[in-house]
Regions:
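Alpha/beta-hydrolase fold catalytic core
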Residues: 1-28, 49-52, 91-92, 260-263
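Conserved HGGG/HGGXW glycine-rich cap/lid loop of the alpha/beta-hydrolase fold
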Residues: 15-64
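Conserved acidic catalytic loop of the alpha/beta-hydrolase fold
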Residues: 77-94
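Gly/Ala-rich beta-loop-alpha elbow adjacent to hydrolase catalytic centers
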Residues: 98, 102, 106
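Flexible "cap/lid" loop of the alpha/beta hydrolase fold
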Residues: 107, 111, 118-148
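Hydrophobic, aromatic-rich cap/lid helix
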Residues: 155, 160, 178-204
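Conserved serine/cysteine hydrolase catalytic core
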Residues: 191-231
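Catalytic active-site module of serine/aspartate enzymes centered on a nucleophile-bearing elbow/loop
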Residues: 233-263
Length: 263
């Protein structure tokens, strides 16, 4: 499994950042969730690239980009990093799409740099305090299990986490388990995940009522949508039946069609 095939790399903030850019047209930037990588968007990128300039990357702490040298996993650090990455790619503005953690980064970026975001698409995005946490993050925060998570996650644990994160209509494949396990097992990534999970984050959700970027919320029907559709002015929402937290891989056709149809 050559996961680096077709990838490019650039140096930002002391990291060798992996990214893939393909297609022509308006720029669409895809941000993955925690414990994931740009590969989660393979099918979506294939559907968007005939009419869009699709840019996706492994976020700091994940995939082939790996840990931040300064171990700073605050959302504001991700926002600053994303701005530098877009500058390096000569992207002035874009449609910004994020799943889970990627959605959290995306809406915070839109709050900080609204003139750089033409449209915002949030897939099962996070960021509201008090939300129930995924099992992997709970384990990373527990002092008793934290050392185990920091050292390594077995393939079996990865399989259990993936199967627990998807909806009833999706079957986690062996190939998906192998890919995610290969990425999370890269040197430093498990430790980076623990650092991320134990980072105190600033709550900016009160600012969402002032966001003036056109926004589309996508969520699975079994997922807590938090309050984005309520708080963001003139926000559109699409609920996809039978889909869990890993929407880019569970419903790539619906997601790609929603992005292309969002005007």
């Amino acid at each position: 499994m050559d996961l680096a095939a077709g990838s490019s790399f650039t140096s930002i903030d002391g990291m060798r950042v992996r990214f893939v850019r393909e297609g022509r047209g308006p720029v669409v930037v895809l941000l993955h969730g925690s414990g994931s990588s740009l590969d989660a968007f393979d099918e979506i990128a294939a559907r968007l690239s005939p009419s869009c300039d699709v840019l996706r990357l492994d976020l700091p702490g994940f995939g082939m980009t790996g840990p931040r040298p300064d171990r700073d996993y605050r959302i504001e650090a991700y926002v600053a990093f994303l701005g530098r990455f877009l500058d390096e790619q000569s992207v002035a503005d874009c449609t910004l799409v994020g799943n889970s953690l990627g959605g959290n980064i995306a809406w915070n970026f839109a709050l900080s740099f609204p003139d750089r975001v033409e449209r915002l698409v949030l897939m099962n995005a996070t960021g509201y305090p008090g939300k129930s946490l995924p099992t992997a993050i709970r384990l990373a925060r527990n002092p008793l299990t934290r050392p185990l998570v920091r050292r390594a996650g077995s393939r079996g644990a990865v399989a259990r986490n993936l199967r627990g994160a998807v909806g009833p209509r999706f079957t986690v494949s062996e190939e998906m388990i192998d890919r995610v396990h290969a990425m999370t097992s890269r040197p430093g990534n498990n430790a980076a995940f623990v650092d991320f999970a134990n980072t105190d984050q600033t709550d900016r959700t009160a600012e969402l009522r002032g966001l003036r970027v056109p926004t589309l919320v996508l969520r699975g029907d079994g997922i807590d949508g938090q309050h984005f559709a309520r708080d963001i002015p003139d926000c559109q929402e699409i609920v996809v039946a039978g889909v869990g937290h890993l929407m880019p891989e569970e419903a790539p056709v619906e997601v790609a069609d929603a992005i292309l149809g969002f005007r």
